[in-house]
């Protein structure tokens, strides 16, 4: 079921926080997602940075300003969000500077500072 949902929508349900507390659990969430009941799943998607980023990229296909501080707390999510939604080119130094500047501004709105540790992307 999760593989089918990922293929159909681009949403990885493993990234959704507290999915067991959703009415109907994971099955109910997947069913509502496939039935395009976005008003029901949006609060659940807003709980974590990865799910917020995926919701903005694959469902809204636009900026989600209310969730940008949550997304900005997670380096990988912000990198993908800024590339797809904000249009930064993360392959160039100028693009990365633009991405980090935008992230810094978003974090400032919630009273956080962008630290070197927060910038560090995992090395796979």
PLM regions with names:
Residues 1-124:
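Alpha-helical scaffold segments
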């Amino acid at each position: 079921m999760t593989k089918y949902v990922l293929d159909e929508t681009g949403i990885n349900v493993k990234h959704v926080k507290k999915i067991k507390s959703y009415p109907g659990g994971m099955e109910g969430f997947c069913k509502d997602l496939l039935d395009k009941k976005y008003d029901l799943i949006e609060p659940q998607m807003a709980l974590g940075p990865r799910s917020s980023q995926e919701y903005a990229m694959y469902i809204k296909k636009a900026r989600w300003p209310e969730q940008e501080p949550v997304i900005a707390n997670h380096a990988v999510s912000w990198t993908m969000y800024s590339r797809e939604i904000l249009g930064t080119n993360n392959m160039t130094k100028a693009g990365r500077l633009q991405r980090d500047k935008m992230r810094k501004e978003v974090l400032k709105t919630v009273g956080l500072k962008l630290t070197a540790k927060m910038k560090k992307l995992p090395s796979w």
